[in-house]
Amino acid sequence: MLVTAFILWASLLTGAWPATPIQDQLPATPRVRLSFKELKATGTAHFFNFLLNTTDYRILLKDEDHDRMYVGSKDYVLSLDLHDINREPLIIHWAASPQRIEECILSGKDGNGECGNFVRLIQPWNRTHLYVCGTGAYNPMCTYVNRGRRAQALPWTQMQVVRGRGSRATDGADRPTPTAPRQDYIFYLEPEKLESGKGKCPYDPKLDTASALINEELYAGVYIDFMGTDAAIFRTLGKQTAMRTDQYNSRWLNDPSFIHAELIPDSAERNDDKLYFFFRERSAEAPQNPAVYARIGRICLNDDGGHCCLVNKWSTFLKARLVCSVPGEDGIETHFDELQDVFVQQTQDVRNPVIYAVFTSSGSVFRGSAVCVYSMADIRMVFNGPFAHKEGPNYQWMPFSGKMPYPRPGTCPGGTFTPSMKSTKDYPDEVINFMRTHPLMYQAVYPLQRRPLVVRTGAPYRLTTVAVDQVDAADGRYEVLFLGTDRGTVQKVIVLPKDDQEVEELMLEEVEVFKEPAPVKTMTISSKRQQLYVASAVGVTHLSLHRCQAYGAACADCCLARDPYCAWDGQACSRYTASSKRRSRRQDVRHGNPIRQCRGFNSNANKNAVESVQYGVAGSAAFLECQPRSPQATVKWLFQRDPSDRRREIRAEDRFLRTEQGLLLRALQLGDRGLYSCTATENNFKHIVTRVQLHVLGRDAVHAALFPPLAVSVPPPPGTGPPTPPYQELAQLLAQPEVGLIHQYCQGYWRHVPPRPREAPGALRPPELQDQKKPRNRRHHPPDT
């Protein structure tokens, strides 16, 4: 019976979640690990490989209505096909002028890494145009770009567009060179609408911005000065008053790094709509020991600022701390404070999306990453709670306990609670003054179950980005997490509830998405097309959300993978699709039980085990290889000397060493001969991976066969055919039971020894032979005159 999405997700998030010491949180092992070359060989990934002299790709906008994805990079704006990013890409070359680049270099900036036009903002203006901004070599600029609707007539001036490998890009300039109108070139930039990007895009390309364009009004968290010291949340464009946060007020913003902006309505009343900003900043709570805190801030869209105080500044700005920590057994929490990325998972209720956030630890002693999940109910509860206030003899932070002005600070005008006030300019002065000095909430926002959903400690990488997809499987709906790392890989992870009210994390796969490892910068997902798009400094890759065939060719392998995208169809592991036939698709994500799901397909599991014969010499070592298909399986070695004997498990001893690749037998003895079986057990399903029949040969017999006396080896007379190998002549003289085994051993030995190449005439001799023959010195006398 199908389980609804809400019931399964609630069972995961509301079950008991016991605290685990942080030192015990080991990195999960992926079931499938693919290199970039192996990923390309599957045919499920494509890398944007057009020869552009650019770097720093950022996926800035996904337009599923037009099947396009818009990417910004250094000096370029790209429009890529969502189905195939290499199919006829549209490319605008938008570089800063040479004069501006020269001025940037003279100001002390790097000519390659800073003095370029790094595109940092692409927002949908309307159905036909985009609004784009770039750093402009430390001179931010913005303009409009035609989306590329073929039915629309083009203006007489336009950018030349690259539509293939052989196309050319226009020469860089602040104002592009006009070209002749072409109906084919429909993706173009409008140079006559070029304007300043101050308050919309940063000067420094290393500083990130978070933006949202709502009702033709641009909201952006950005640094607005050349030195990168004045950070603000701005509102520009549109008909409303231009707004910003209070300038140089560390209580509002203190050296922030903006991550994400999202419009989330509070109620059915549109006047209650709020824009949420996610960022990290240096905390002002403890100035003697400043730390980095993750924050969530919000503003009302209809905020007009104050009448006498906070003129043209936000009068509804509030912020709270986002906590992502692991509680310890002693009550001390290990915090992950550096917010890196945010993904907002929409639900059927647009007012209550689920917030996924990636955090990393501060400092260099302890390195770790975590993913925490937050609910809007908890976020709203904190913003409706007490304000942080400094009071007492030590001037410490306390919850504000005085008289609260009306309307409550942070309330939107004309909304559910203030229907009579049409503007924030109508608010009393005590409300505005309170907002200026009390922007911080006293309580913090904690994740669901007050602990992370995913934790990575002791790993050689850090998480950088997150994207989430909801997948309908045979036994319910699951949330699949795609996590980008700073070494250029993407992990596919699901977290399942267990019967004992704990949770279980499964890393289904880890793939390298770039030829050259580079940190994943941005990532977006298309559930409609079942594709994931990943960007870094070196390029853009799009890959399928599933590679079912990589799990194996058996029903048990497909079932044990527990991938919600995949199921056994009777022939292979393939994409799961809902069917009216109950047994047409074998899938068990919740339990992964192949014994129950793969009845009729498991009988051949042991029959298909690889069997081999291996030889060893007494006193030497032998390595028996065993590579189970799943790294999550438990491997055991069983030994059987004769068919009539019982199999016994090989324990780790002085002479037996178990490794990830197999079993090493040191100092072989004649009693070690027999049948070795490598078994893999996963989720109570056991099967034989490989069988090795080991023959142990005596040292004396092998030595005599390989190095016989000279009298035995007599060269045959000419014309009698190839000489008989000396070990065969010795074998005819010996009558020991293991002579046949020695013969097989030697045949295999000589078959694998590469033949010695014959010396060509004039070939160089070894130095020791060259030294034996000294060259003769010739004296050349001048001819007699």
From Swiss-Prot:
* Signal peptide per UniProt: 1-18
Organism domain of life: Eukaryota
**Taxonomic path:** Eukaryota, Metazoa, Chordata, Craniata, Vertebrata
Q: Where is the Ig-like C2-type domain?
A: 605-695
UniProt GO cellular component terms: extracellular space; glutamatergic synapse
Q: Which cysteines are joined by disulfide bonds?
A: 104-115, 133-142, 300-412, 324-372, 548-566, 678-746
Subcellular location per UniProt equals: Secreted
**What Gene3D superfamilies has UniProt attached to this entry?**
Immunoglobulins, ligand-binding face of the semaphorins, domain 2, YVTN repeat-like/Quinoprotein amine dehydrogenase
Listed CDD domains:
Ig_Sema3, Sema_3F
The organs and tissues expressing this protein are described as: Expressed ubiquitously in adulthood. During embryogenesis, expressed in subregions of the central nervous system and various other tissues like skin, kidney, lung and intestine.
Q: Which GO terms describe its biological process?
A: axon extension involved in axon guidance; axon guidance; branchiomotor neuron axon guidance; facial nerve structural organization; negative chemotaxis; negative regulation of axon extension involved in axon guidance; nerve development; neural crest cell migration involved in autonomic nervous system development
What range(s) does the Sema domain occupy? 31-545
Keyword Disulfide bond attributed:
yes
The entry assigns this protein to a family as follows: Belongs to the semaphorin family.
Compositional bias (Basic residues): 775-785
List UniProt keywords, sorted A-Z.
Disulfide bond, Glycoprotein, Immunoglobulin domain, Secreted, Signal
* PROSITE patterns for this protein: IG_LIKE, SEMA
* Protein name, UniProt field: Semaphorin-3F
Q: Which SMART domains does the UniProt record give?
A: IG, IGc2, PSI, Sema
Does Secreted count among this protein's keywords? Answer: yes
Entry-linked InterPro entries: Ig-like_dom, Ig-like_dom_sf, Ig-like_fold, Ig_sub, Ig_sub2, PSI, Semap_dom, Semap_dom_sf
Q: Where is this region: Disordered?
A: 583-602, 753-785
